From Swiss-Prot:
Official protein name in the record: Probable serine/threonine-protein kinase DDB_G0268876
UniProt record similarity statement: Belongs to the protein kinase superfamily. TKL Ser/Thr protein kinase family.
One BP annotation, GO: signal transduction
Key words, A-Z: ATP-binding, Kinase, Nucleotide-binding, Serine/threonine-protein kinase, Transferase
Length: 1385
C-alpha cells in the first residue's frame, strides 16, 4: 500500500502559490510525493516519516493524502484519515478547508520518485535544497552527490551508550523488512554517532543483528538469510535478502548488550521495491521536533494533545544523549504528568520499565513532578516482588532517601508507605532497609507533621526492629528519637507501633539495656502514679460480668456477639496493651539486671502486671503470666518474697480455672518456682484448687508441665486433709515424680520426729541394714526401724522409696509411717506397732489354727490392700507373709515398700524374695507388670493353707530350674477347698495375662465369703467382727462382746501431749523373720533382712479367740490412728481413744466465704455459669456448702479423710465392688468419663478406682476452696463497693465438734449401731448376692453389689461429677470357667 502525499508550503496562499523560481504550483498537477506504508505500522511511524519527508513540522504545510488499498480502499482511507486528522487537530496547526483525502486506483504503478536523506549540515540547509517537485531518478542521484560532498555531517542513528534502546535503528531495520522482497537485496547503512551527534568512524567489531522468524518449525527457515559487512568506511552495511515471508523478531546487540528492550515484530509483504541507498535521521529533525513539542506544552489547552502526537516519541526524546534536549524534554514530560490520568496512562502502557529508565537519567530528580511520579509508582509497585528485587539491585536505596526529602508532602508519604510495605511483606529485602541512609530517612520522616507518614514510619521501624543492634551509631540515634517521640505521642495507634518496636528491641540484650538506661521504665510505669492505678484502655473482666447479669437471656450467642463488638471497638487499645505486656516480658527475659526483676515484683510494676491478668485478651494474659514466671525464677529471692507477700498466689490459682492452654504452663511454673522458695505459700489452697491441678496433671501426662504440677502437689500432700485426695487423684504419675523429688532432696514428706521424743524399750529385730526397736512416742506404742548407713545392705534409694510410700498412702490394709528422720547418720522410720507380728510368724508358730474362714478374711484384706497399690500404679515386688503384719483384731497391713516402685516401661531384674518371684521376674525380664504381685499372692495363699515354706525340700538352684523349665509348682494340700485350689492355680500360672487382677480376686473372695456365710460357716458377731463358727475351719467363738476392740491409738490432729489411754493395742513395724532356708530371703543386694528377737514371739494370749474382732471387709476394719503430726488420715476410720472435745482444738472463729469474680472473656467459650467453678474475680459471693456424706461413704480404701473435718460416729460402711454393670455404673455418678485401659496406668483395667474416687469426690474440706482475695487492682475505691460482706454462717468446724461429741458420748451405743448396720447390710448382701452373680456373667466375675448403689444415691446427688474415671476390669476366660463351677457348687 502506498500513500500519495501532496504537500504545499504554508507560505503559499490562495488557489496557488509561486515557488522559488516564480512558477505557480498547480495542486492538480503531478507535484506529488509517494509514501509507502503498511497497515500494520503504528501511527508513530507515519508521523516520523512525515517529519523526515518534509524536514519541518507539518504545521507549516498543507497536506493532501491519498490512500491506495487494492483490497479495501474506502475503509483504509477512512482509518488513516481519522488518525491524521486527530494528529492535526491542534490549535496551533492551520487546518485548511482544501485538505482532502482521495482514493486513487493505481494499477501496477511503480513510483518513480524516492525519498533521499536530508543534507547533513545545519537545519537551514533545507532552503538550499530544490523543491520537491518533478523529482525523478536523476534528481535522486544528484542528491546523493550533494550528500556525499557535504563532509562532517551530523547524523544520528544509534546511541553510543551501551544498553540504550535505539528506536531509529529498530525502525530502520523494520522498514527494510517491510520493503524487502524475495530475491531482492535490501541494504541498510548503520551509522554510529556520539552524544553530540557527531559521526564515530571506528565502528565496534562486535556489532550483531539477528533477525529470527517466529513460530517456525523448520530449522532452516528460522533465521533469515542475510549478509553483514562489518566494516566499510564510516558505516556498517547490513544486507537483507528475505526468503520466506512471515513475522520476524529483531535482536540487536553491541558488545553482547541488548539495545532493543522489546523485539520489533513485523511482516514481510510481497511487493516490488528498489534498493534503498541510504537511511538516516538528522539532528535538524530532532531540533524541529523539540521546537514543536515545546510549542504545544506552553499552553494548557494543548498540552494534553502531546499524547496525540505520541508519547512514545516524547519518551524517546527524553533519553536522547544530548543533555540540553534531554533536560528540556524531561521538563515537558514532568509538566505533562501533573494530571493523574496521564500518570496512569504512562504506567499502564510502559509498565515498570519506564521507572527504571527514568531514574537512570541524571537530572530527573530536579523536577518535582517526576519525583512524585516515581514516589507514587514505588507506592503502587511495593507489593510486587519482581519489581522490588530489580529495583534494589539496579537502582538502589538512595533513591528513597532522595524522594523522601522532597518538599511536597506526597513524596515522603509515599516513601513511608513504600518502606512499611516492603519491610512487612519481604523479610529478604530487609538487608537493604537497615542501611544508615534509610535509618536517617526514618528519623526525618518521624519529624514530619503528617499522621500517615508517622504511622507508616513507626510501622517500618517495628518491622525492622528485630534486625537492629548497637553496633551502629544510626541505631542508637534512632532509638533515642523513638523514646523522645513516645513521650510526645498521645494517640493509641502510635503507641501500639512504638511498643511493638520496643518489644522487639528488648529481645536483644544490648538494646534492652540501652532502653532501660534511657528511661523506658518511666514510660511503662510512671513513678508519679502513687495510687497504683493506670489508665490502660482495656476491656476488663467486670465488663463481662456486668453483661452476664444485665442480659436476661444471657445465652452464649449474645455473649459472644457482645465480646466480638467490644473487640472491634477496642482493637487498637487491645493491641497497645498486648505489646506493652510483651515488652515487659521480653525485657525480663533479656536483661540480667536484678533491678528490673525487682521493679516488676512490687509497686507500680506489679500492679500493672496484675491488671494484665484480668484483661480480656488471651495474649495479654499470657505475657503477664510469662512475666510472673520469669520473676519467680529470678536469682533475686526478694522478688519471690515480694510476689508472695503481694498475694499473687490467689490470682494465679484462680486464673487456672479460666486459663487457656497457652496460659496454663506459665501459671503452673510460676507456682512451682514460688513453692521452691517458700513451700508454705500454697498452703491455703482448697479442694477445688487441688482437683484442678490433678485434672491438669492427667490432661497431658507426657508434657513437662506434669512435673511442675506434681511438685506443687508434693508440697500440699504434707497436709493430712489433702493427702489421700492427692494420692488417689494423682495416681502413679504423681507418685513417680514424688519419689523422684524425695530422692533428689527437693521435698521431704517424712514428718520429722526427734529422737529425744522416742522412748525405745527393746530390740525386736535385726537385719543387714539396721535394727527394729519397740518403744513409745507420746504414750503410743510404736516400732522404730533404725538404719545403719555403713551396712552393705543399706540402700538410701530404698529408704526414701519406703518412707515416701508409707507416709503418703492411706488404706486400712497398708502400714502407715508416722514419721521419722532422713538426716544422715540418724535415719529411722516410726511406724505403728502390731502385736501379732507378721503373717509368717502366725504360719510358722503353729499356735493358732488358720481356718478357711480366717484365710478368706486374711486373703481378702491382702487383695484389697494390693488392689489399692495397683490402682496407684505401684508394684510391691516383694509380697510375702513376712511383709504382711497383723494387728490385734486380725487385720492385715502390708509393709516393707523398700523394693516397691511405680510401674515403668523398664523394671529392675530379679527383685524380691526368690520363692515368691513370678516366672517372668525369675527369667530376668524387665517388662513385667503388676501381675507379678498376683503370682506372689498365690504363694501367700498356698502358705496359709499348707503352713509350709515353698520349695523347702529343694535347693534354690534346683527349684528355680524346675519352675522355669517344667512350670513346677508346690503341691496343694488335699484338704484345700476347691475354691482356694482354683484361685491359687490361676494366680500362679506362668502367663501373666492369664492371671486375674486383684479386683477380680476381691470379687471372687467376697462371693466365697458370702457362700460361707450362707452355709453357716461365717456369722456377724455383736462386736461387728466376722468369725467362723463350727464345722469347717472355725475361727473362734465370740462371746458377744468386744472387750478388746481396737481403734487407732494415734490421732494426728488430736494429740496434745497428754496420754489418757493405755490401750493394749500395739503397732508393729515390718518384721522380716530370718530363716535358715534361703528361699525366704530376698536378693542380698537389694533386701533388708530383719532378725526378730525371741522375746517378741507371739504368745497364746495373742491368739486368744476372745480378742478376735475381725471385720468381714476392710471397710469395717479398725485401723490404728497415726501419731501427732503425721501426714496421714490413719485415724479417719474410727474414733480415737483420746479423741474428745477436751483434747481436740476448737475453732472459735468462722472461715469467711470467698469473694470472687466470674471470668467470662470474649476469647474463650462461654461456659454455663451455674456449673462453673468460682474464680478469683466473682462479684457475687456464693456459699460453699460442706455436705456430710459419711452415712453414704462406700469407699473401701478411704473411709472419711479426716476426723477434724468429717463426722465418723455412725458411718454405715458397706462393701462396694467397683466392677459393675453398665446400669449400675450409670447410677454411680453422672458424667463419669471412660478410663484409659492401659495396664501400666493408675486407672488400669482390673484395678478399678470406684471406691477411692467416690471417696475423693465425696470428701470436702471444711475450708473454702480457693482464697479470700482483695478486690481487683484497678481503681480499688471504685470496686470496693462491689465486694460482698463475709458470710456469717456456721462453719463446718462447728459441725465437726458436734459430731465429735456424738462420737465420744457413748461408744457402746456406737457399737450397737454398727452392729445393726452391719446386720442390715449383710442381710441385703444375702438377698442380692445371687442377683449380682447372674447379672454379671458377661464380665466373668461374680460381683456383689450389696446395698451400695441404694446407699449412694444421696451421695451422688450431693457430689459433683466424678473427676477420676472408673475403669472396668477385663474378662478372664479362666475366671468364667471358675465362676460356672462356683455356681454349680
Amino acid at each position: 500500500m502506498r500513500v500519495l502525499v501532496h504537500v504545499n508550503n504554508a507560505k503559499q496562499s490562495g488557489d496557488g502559490a509561486n515557488n522559488s523560481n516564480g512558477t505557480l504550483i498547480n495542486y492538480n498537477s503531478n507535484n506529488k510525493l509517494f509514501l509507502e506504508i503498511h497497515p500494520n505500522q503504528s501511527i508513530w511511524m507515519i508521523k516520523t516519516l512525515l517529519f523526515n519527508l518534509f524536514q519541518i513540522p507539518p504545521a507549516r504545510q498543507q497536506l493532501y493524502l491519498k490512500v491506495v488499498d487494492e483490497i479495501n480502499p474506502r475503509e483504509t482511507s477512512k482509518a488513516y484519515s481519522k488518525l491524521l486528522q486527530s494528529y492535526r487537530l491542534v490549535k496551533d496547526y492551520k487546518i485548511y478547508e482544501g485538505t482532502e483525502l482521495q482514493m486513487v486506483a493505481l494499477e501496477k504503478e511503480i513510483p518513480s520518485e524516492f525519498l533521499v536523506p536530508p543534507k547533513k549540515t545545519q537545519s537551514n540547509s533545507m532552503e538550499k535544497l530544490p523543491h520537491f517537485t518533478n523529482l525523478s531518478m536523476s534528481s535522486m542521484s544528484n542528491m546523493d552527490e550533494i550528500l556525499s560532498g557535504s563532509g562532517g555531517g551530523r547524523i544520528h542513528v544509534l546511541s553510543s551508550k551501551k544498553g540504550e534502546e535505539c528506536p531509529a535503528l529498530c525502525f530502520a531495520v523494520g522498514k527494510g523488512l517491510y520493503r524487502g522482497i524475495s530475491g531482492v537485496i535490501y541494504e541498510i547503512k548503520l551509522y554510529r554517532v556520539d552524544s553530540k551527534g557527531m559521526l564515530i568512524v571506528n565502528t565496534s567489531l562486535n556489532f550483531q543483528i539477528d533477525v529470527i522468524k517466529k513460530d517456525s518449525i523448520s530449522v532452516e527457515d528460522r533465521k533469515m538469510a542475510f549478509t553483514y559487512e562489518q566494516r566499510k568506511s564510516d558505516y556498517s552495511l547490513l544486507k537483507l535478502q528475505p526468503i520466506i515471508y512471515g513475522e520476524y523478531s529483531i535482536s540487536i546487540k553491541i558488545d553482547d548488550t541488548p539495545i532493543c528492550g522489546s523485539p520489533f515484530h513485523c511482516t514481510i509483504i510481497d511487493e516490488l521495491n528498489p534498493n534503498l541507498k541510504e537511511l538516516a535521521f538528522s539532528n535538524e529533525w530532532i531540533e524541529e521536533v523539540v521546537q514543536l513539542i515545546t510549542l504545544m506544552s506552553n499552553k494548557p489547552s494543548t498540552i494534553d494533545k502531546l499524547f496525540s502526537f505520541g508519547i512514545e516519541g516524547l519518551m524517546n526524546l527524553m533519553f536522547y544523549p544530548d543533555p540540553t534536549i534531554q533536560i528540556h524534554i524531561i521538563g515537558i514530560f514532568a509538566k505533562l504528568i501533573e494530571k493523574d490520568k496521564n500518570k496512569e496512562r504512562v504506567l499502564k502502557e510502559f509498565g515498570m520499565d519506564f521507572i527504571f529508565k527514568l531514574v537512570s537519567l541524571d537530572n530527573w530528580s530536579n523536577f518535582m513532578e517526576l519525583r512524585k511520579l516515581v514516589a507514587s509508582s514505588l507506592c503502587i509497585l511495593s507489593c510486587y516482588k519482581p519489581f522490588l528485587n530489580r529495583f534494589f539491585k539496579e537502582v538502589g536505596i538512595d533513591v528513597i532517601s532522595l524522594i523522601a526529602r522532597s518538599d511536597f508532602i506526597d513524596c515522603p508519604r509515599s516513601c513511608a508507605i513504600f518502606l512499611s510495605r516492603v519491610s512487612e511483606i519481604s523479610f529478604e529485602l530487609n538487608e537493604y532497609l537497615i542501611s544508615d541512609s534509610i535509618k536517617e530517612t526514618l528519623i526525618y520522616l518521624l519529624s514530619i507533621q503528617d499522621n500517615i507518614t508517622v504511622n507508616c514510619t513507626l510501622k517500618t521501624i517495628s518491622n525492622l526492629s528485630s534486625s537492629f543492634d548497637l553496633k551502629k551509631e544510626s541505631n542508637i540515634k534512632l532509638l533515642s528519637n523513638l523514646l523522645e517521640y513516645c513521650k510526645e505521642f498521645q494517640e493509641i495507634s502510635k503507641k501500639v507501633l512504638i511498643f511493638k518496636s520496643f518489644s522487639n528491641f528488648c529481645v536483644n540484650e544490648s538494646l534492652c539495656t540501652f532502653l532501660i538506661s534511657n528511661g523506658i521504665l518511666d514510660l511503662i510505669t510512671p513513678t508519679h502514679d502513687k495510687s497504683g492505678y493506670f489508665g490502660i484502655p482495656m476491656f476488663c473482666q467486670w465488663e463481662s460480668n456486668t453483661i452476664n447479669y444485665i442480659i436476661s437471656n444471657n445465652n452464649e450467642i449474645n455473649l459472644k456477639q457482645y465480646g466480638y463488638e467490644f473487640n472491634q471497638i477496642f482493637k487498637e487499645e487491645t493491641d497497645y496493651v498486648f505489646f506493652l505486656s510483651l515488652t515487659i516480658s521480653n525485657m525480663l527475659v533479656s536483661t540480667t539486671s536484678l533491678k528490673i526483676h525487682d521493679h516488676f515484683s512490687r509497686g507500680n510494676g506489679l500492679n500493672l502486671l496484675k491488671q494484665f491478668i484480668i484483661c480480656h485478651e488471651c495474649s495479654v494474659r499470657s505475657e503477664a503470666f510469662r512475666s510472673f514466671m520469669i520473676i519467680s525464677n529470678s536469682p533475686n529471692d526478694q522478688c519471690k518474697k515480694h510476689l508472695i507477700q503481694s498475694g499473687i498466689i490467689p490470682y494465679l490459682v484462680s486464673s487456672l480455672f479460666d486459663s487457656l492452654s497457652v496460659e496454663t504452663p506459665f501459671i503452673v511454673n510460676t507456682l512451682a518456682n514460688l513453692c521452691k522458695y517458700d513451700p508454705t505459700c500454697v498452703e491455703n489452697m482448697g479442694v477445688d484448687d487441688i482437683d484442678k491441678f490433678i485434672e491438669l496433671l492427667h490432661r497431658d501426662s507426657t508434657s513437662s508441665l506434669s512435673k511442675s504440677i506434681s511438685y506443687i502437689l508434693s508440697h500440699l500432700i504434707r497436709h493430712d486433709k489433702y493427702k489421700q485426695r492427692i494420692v488417689n487423684g494423682g495416681g502413679k504419675l504423681f507418685l513417680q515424680y514424688l519419689i523422684e523429688f524425695v530422692r533428689q532432696g527437693e521435698i521431704s514428706v517424712l514428718k520429722y520426729i526427734s529422737q529425744s521424743d522416742l522412748e525405745l524399750t527393746k530390740e525386736i529385730g535385726r537385719g543387714v541394714s539396721g535394727v527394729v526397736k519397740r518403744g513409745k512416742w507420746k504414750g503410743y506404742e510404736i516400732a522404730v526401724k533404725q538404719f545403719n548407713e555403713e551396712e552393705l545392705g543399706f540402700s538410701e534409694r530404698e529408704f526414701h522409696s519406703e518412707a515416701t510410700i508409707m507416709s503418703v498412702l492411706r488404706h486400712d490394709n497398708i502400714v502407715h509411717c508416722v514419721g521419722g528422720s532422713a538426716q544422715p547418720g540418724k535415719m529411722y522410720l516410726v511406724c505403728d506397732y502390731y502385736s501379732r507380728g507378721s503373717l509368717y510368724s502366725v504360719i510358722t508358730a503353729n499356735i493358732c489354727p488358720l481356718s478357711n474362714a480366717r484365710i478368706v478374711h486374711l486373703a481378702l484384706q491382702v487383695a484389697k490392700g494390693m488392689n489399692y497399690l495397683h490402682s496407684l500404679g505401684i508394684i510391691h515386688r516383694d509380697l510375702k507373709p513376712g511383709n504382711l503384719l497383723i494387728d490385734q483384731d486380725w487385720n492385715i497391713r502390708i509393709s516393707d515398700f523398700g523394693l516397691s516402685r511405680v510401674v515403668d516401661n523398664r523394671m529392675t531384674k530379679t527383685v524380691g524374695t526368690p520363692c515368691y518371684m513370678a516366672v517372668e521376674v525369675l527369667k530376668g525380664l524387665t517388662d513385667y507388670s503388676q501381675q507379678a504381685d498376683v503370682y506372689s499372692f498365690a504363694f501367700v495363699l498356698w502358705e496359709c493353707i499348707s503352713r509350709q515354706i515353698p520349695y523347702k525340700d529343694f535347693a534354690q538352684i534346683q527349684w528355680i530350674s524346675m519352675v522355669l523349665e517344667d512350670s513346677f509348682r508346690p503341691p496343694i494340700p488335699d484338704s484345700c477347698l476347691p475354691e482356694f485350689r482354683d484361685l491359687i492355680t490361676m494366680c500362679w500360672t506362668s502367663n501373666p495375662d492369664d492371671r486375674p487382677s486383684f479386683q477380680q480376686i476381691i470379687t471372687y473372695l467376697e462371693n466365697l465369703r458370702l457362700k460361707m456365710q450362707d452355709q453357716g460357716i461365717y456369722q456377724i458377731l455383736t462386736g461387728g467382727s466376722s468369725v467362723g463358727i463350727g464345722g469347717v475351719g472355725v475361727v473362734g467363738v465370740g462371746s458377744g462382746g468386744n472387750s478388746d476392740e481396737h481403734e487407732s491409738n494415734i490421732d494426728i490432729d488430736t494429740v496434745s501431749g497428754s496420754n489418757n489411754n493405755e490401750s493394749s493395742t500395739a503397732v508393729s513395724l515390718n518384721e522380716n523373720k530370718i530363716n535358715i532356708d534361703m528361699s525366704m530371703h530376698p536378693t542380698e543386694e537389694l533386701k533388708n533382712l530383719v532378725e526378730v528377737s525371741k522375746d517378741d514371739n507371739p504368745t497364746n494370749s495373742d491368739y486368744d479367740i476372745r480378742s478376735s474382732s475381725t471385720s468381714s471387709s476392710p471397710s469395717t476394719l479398725s485401723a490404728p490412728q497415726s501419731p501427732v503430726g503425721s501426714t496421714s488420715p490413719m485415724g479417719s476410720t474410727s474414733t480415737s481413744p483420746i479423741s474428745n472435745n477436751n483434747n481436740r482444738p476448737t475453732h472459735d472463729h468462722q472461715q469467711p466465704h470467698q469473694v470472687k469474680w466470674e471470668r467470662i472473656v470474649p476469647d474463650k467459650p462461654n461456659p454455663n455459669l451455674k456449673s462453673k467453678r468460682l474464680s478469683a474475680f466473682r462479684n457475687k459471693a456464693v456459699p460453699i456448702s460442706i455436705t456430710d456424706n459419711n452415712n453414704n461413704n462406700n469407699s473401701a480404701n478411704n473411709n472419711n479423710n479426716n476426723n477434724s473435718m468429717k463426722n465418723n460416729s455412725n458411718a454405715s460402711r458397706n462393701t462396694f465392688s467397683s466392677v459393675s454393670s453398665p446400669s449400675s455404673s450409670a447410677d454411680l455418678s453422672s458424667g463419669i468419663e471412660s478410663s484409659n485401659n492401659r495396664d501400666d496406668s493408675f486407672l488400669s483395667s482390673g484395678s478399678s478406682l470406684s471406691e477411692q474416687h467416690r471417696s475423693v469426690s465425696n470428701s470436702v474440706s471444711n475450708s473454702v476452696g480457693g482464697f479470700s482475695l482483695p478486690p481487683p487492682p484497678l481503681a480499688p475505691s471504685f470496686y470496693a463497693s462491689m465486694i460482698n460482706e463475709k458470710i456469717s454462717s456456721s462453719t463446718p468446724t462447728d459441725n465437726n465438734n458436734n459430731n465429735n461429741n456424738n462420737n465420744n458420748n457413748n461408744n457402746n451405743n456406737n457399737n450397737n449401731n454398727n452392729n445393726n448396720n452391719n446386720n442390715n447390710n449383710n442381710n441385703n448382701n444375702n438377698n442380692n448376692s445371687n442377683n449380682s452373680i447372674n447379672n454379671n456373667n458377661n464380665n466373668g466375675i461374680a460381683i456383689n453389689y450389696t446395698n451400695s448403689i441404694n446407699n449412694n444415691k444421696n451421695s451422688n446427688n450431693n457430689t459433683s461429677n466424678t473427676k477420676y474415671p472408673i475403669s472396668k476390669c477385663k474378662s478372664n476366660p479362666s475366671f468364667e470357667a471358675l465362676k460356672s463351677k462356683f455356681d454349680k457348687d
